[in-house]
């Protein structure tokens, strides 16, 4: 049972932390684990309780907890969440709540296209000179789409047929 809890611990420890190895968890991810797994129910166990337990089990000046400290925290939260049960039984119930859980990304902000926003952000609907600033895929062309680049490769400024002299003379 503890190995499944350890896997859940690692999944939450790495969540949102690109530099994390999954061996230590910060307070943010600890709170997320408690919320997503249903340990924090808002009545018997609140977010304040979770923060207090985290501060209690972590080292004095540390910002993260190890899996051993996490187990201590779960024992404390288990006794609070499942009142009247033995500490081992409460811990077992906590681990059952954690089984197979992953960090949830519900409620994460997504791009919206409400009202006129879709009209303004869809490059295929652009008209006039703005249309020339994007290719067919909608990717910007950069400076080539913003400025008319003149070709100054002729003999004089008005000469348009650069490189055609030899072709005419060889007939």
From Swiss-Prot:
Basic and acidic residues compositional bias, start-end: 129-149
Stored InterPro entries: EF-hand-dom_pair (IPR011992), TPP/p25 (IPR008907)
Region (Disordered): 120-171
GO MF entries: tubulin binding
One CC-aspect GO term: cytosol
Alphabetical UniProt keywords: Cell projection, Cilium, Cytoplasm, Differentiation, Flagellum, Spermatogenesis
Origin superkingdom: Eukaryota
Keyword ATP-binding applies: no
Listed GO biological process terms: cell differentiation; microtubule bundle formation; microtubule polymerization; positive regulation of protein polymerization; regulation of flagellated sperm motility; spermatogenesis
Transmembrane segments: none
Entry-linked PANTHER family: P25 ALPHA-RELATED (PTHR12932), TUBULIN POLYMERIZATION-PROMOTING PROTEIN FAMILY MEMBER 2 (PTHR12932:SF21)
Family the entry assigns: Belongs to the TPPP family.
Record protein name field: Tubulin polymerization-promoting protein family member 2
Species whose genome carries this gene: Bos taurus (Bovine)
């Amino acid at each position: 049972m503890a190995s499944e809890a350890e896997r859940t611990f690692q999944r939450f420890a790495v969540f949102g932390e690109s530099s994390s190895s999954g061996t230590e968890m910060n307070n943010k991810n600890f709170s997320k684990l408690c919320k997503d797994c249903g340990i924090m129910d808002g009545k018997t166990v609140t977010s304040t309780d979770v923060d207090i337990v985290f501060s209690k089990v972590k080292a004095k000046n540390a910002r993260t907890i190890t899996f051993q400290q996490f187990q201590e925290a779960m024992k404390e939260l288990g006794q609070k969440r499942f009142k009247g049960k033995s500490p081992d039984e409460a811990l077992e119930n906590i681990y059952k709540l954690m089984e197979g859980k992953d960090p949830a990304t519900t409620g994460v902000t997504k791009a919206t296209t409400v009202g006129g926003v879709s009209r303004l952000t869809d490059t295929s609907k652009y008209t006039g000179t703005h249309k020339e600033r994007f290719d067919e895929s909608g990717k910007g062309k950069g400076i080539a789409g913003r400025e008319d680049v003149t070709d100054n490769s002729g003999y004089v400024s008005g000469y348009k047929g650069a490189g055609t002299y030899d072709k005419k003379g060889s007939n």
